[in-house]
Amino acid sequence: MGGAGILLFLLAWAGAGVAWSPPKGKCPPHCSCSKENTLCEGSPELPESFSTTLLSLSLVRMGVSRLKAGSFLKMPSLHLLLFTSNTFSVIEGDAFIGLSYLQYLFIEDNKIGSISKNALRGLRSLTHLSLANNHLEALPRFLFRGLETLTHVDLRGNPFQCDCRVLWLLQWMPTVNASVGTGACAGPPAVAQIQLNHLDPKKFKCRATELSWLQTVGESALSVESFSYQGEPHMVLAQPFAGRCLILVWDYSLQRFRPEEELSAPSVVSCKPLVLGPRLFILAARLWGGSQLWSRSSPDLRLTPVQVLAPQRLLRPNDAELLWLDGQPCFVVADASKAGSTTLLCRDGPGFYPRQSLHAWHRDTDAEALELDGRPHLLLASASQRPVLFHWVGGRFERRTDIPEAEDVYATKHFQAGGDVFLCLTRYIGDSMVMRWDGSMFRLLQQLPSRGSHVFQPLLIARDQLAILGSDFAFSQVFRFESDKGILEPLQELGPPALVAPRAFAQVTVAGRRFLFAACFKGPTQIYQHHELDLSA
């Protein structure tokens, strides 16, 4: 609203310009008063001595630099309030509290440093609001909360930076029964001069993810797994130098993880949990001394060894995975010995017994269970050839295909996104790879430099599909899958403290908090907390 428009509006509000002489002391200096209307210009401070029947107040070129909370408590009858050509460093929260009858608020052609998100609180009768031409680059989120009676909002003439700070405004506009004038964006350059109300909120990326260090678990570890038992999340670490499988739980009073139980397992490489109702199994795959199955039949008992697993077959285990076949739980143990073979162990009565030997003489380093085309599949990585994909047919695994252009792959992990299945293939030196299943085979999608990598682990944490590429020589890298691009994008480095020879990652959610465990072979296990940051706030 220009100066002429303001003047006409005030004359109309005054009603035929009827002269009125206010009681002595009721019209402050620098002000012109009528019975129901006042215009003040150039006053060094906010006037207070007004008639209790005052309906409209206009403040022009004031010397006030700050509108404080409760600035208008002595003017409860105001229906219209106008500011123009002023300079405010800040408009504080509750600046207009007490103006429950105010219908028109025009704050126009001013220079405003900042506005509190609670500045307009209490204006329950407000119908017309103008913040036009105030040099504002953004508005605080929730500024209009509680203004249910608004019918007209004018935000034009402000140099809005149309980044994440305006996302809340774009999401708010369709939800109100008010006409909103927004004007054009002043920046960033990609959207400069585009009308703000023409922007698509869905194209804004205003969530940030951060993994911050929380805790250290002293001993080194080769693997880490999460599982839920009796409704409580647990973690189990394979600690070969300590000779144990260490089970951790969350201490709600100390707000950190603490040991709950440990299983004696010298030279252990993997501790794989399986929960069947009240019963808990832990498979301890060991390099020497025989792999064992531990069991707890009820929550009030401790885990005890119940079975030595296939002592003639499991010669040098390197990895163990859990999978379900025809409704029964099975373990697959990848064997890295020269004369060994990967073994499938399935439940039969009280224990787990060999069901099938796979991939003899290939020195397998990793096994990954996955589902493709609605059927169980098994992917084996080995030191001697490209990864081989098996599928479950007629009660056994049969070779289906291998992974092209994937030599020297140490480990494989998979994830799903947007209905597609992706592989993360770990190579120690060179390029680790991301591949996508096309219905008949996996095809190369992306390559990421590896510098001493033994693990390339995908993890779904909250809404973030992450993948962590470990490194023995540098900081481990965290990537996030961007669904619109279909690739992994760098997110952050893990550290400090730096991970020393990371070998496995796992995530767990406890009491609404999300944690990432990093098992390290030459250093302590590190625990990080996952945070979601709203950049539009």
UniProtKB/Swiss-Prot annotation:
UniProt keyword Protease, yes or no: no
Extent of the signal sequence: 1-19
Residue windows of the LRR repeats: 53-74, 77-98, 101-122, 125-146
Repeat positions for EAR: 210-252, 256-298, 302-349, 351-394, 396-439, 441-483, 487-532
Domain named LRRCT: residues: 158-208
Main location: secreted
PROSITE patterns: EAR
Cellular component GO terms held in the UniProt record: extracellular space
Top-level taxonomic group: Eukaryota
SUPFAM superfamilies: L domain-like
Keywords linked to the UniProt accession: Glycoprotein, Leucine-rich repeat, Repeat, Secreted, Signal
Any single GO BP term: regulation of myelination
Known tissue expression: Brain. Expressed in the entire developing peripheral nerves. Strongly expressed in the trigeminal nerve and ganglion and particularly abundant in the boundary cap cells - a transient population of cells that contributes to the Schwann cell population of the dorsal root nerve.
InterPro entries referenced in this protein's UniProt entry, alphabetically: Cys-rich_flank_reg_C, EAR, EPTP, Leu-rich_rpt, Leu-rich_rpt_typical-subtyp, LGI_related, LRR_dom_sf
Carbohydrate attachment residues: 177
Annotated localization: Secreted
Function noted in UniProt: Component of Schwann cell signaling pathway(s) that controls axon segregation and myelin formation.
Subunit structure: Can bind to ADAM11, ADAM22 and ADAM23.
Disease linkage: Defects in Lgi4 are the cause of the claw paw (clp) phenotype. Mice are characterized by limb posture abnormalities and peripheral hypomyelination, with no sign of dysmyelination in the CNS.
Name of protein: Leucine-rich repeat LGI family member 4
Source organism of the structure: Mus musculus (Mouse)
Lineage: Eukaryota, Metazoa, Chordata, Craniata, Vertebrata
Designated gene of the protein: Lgi4
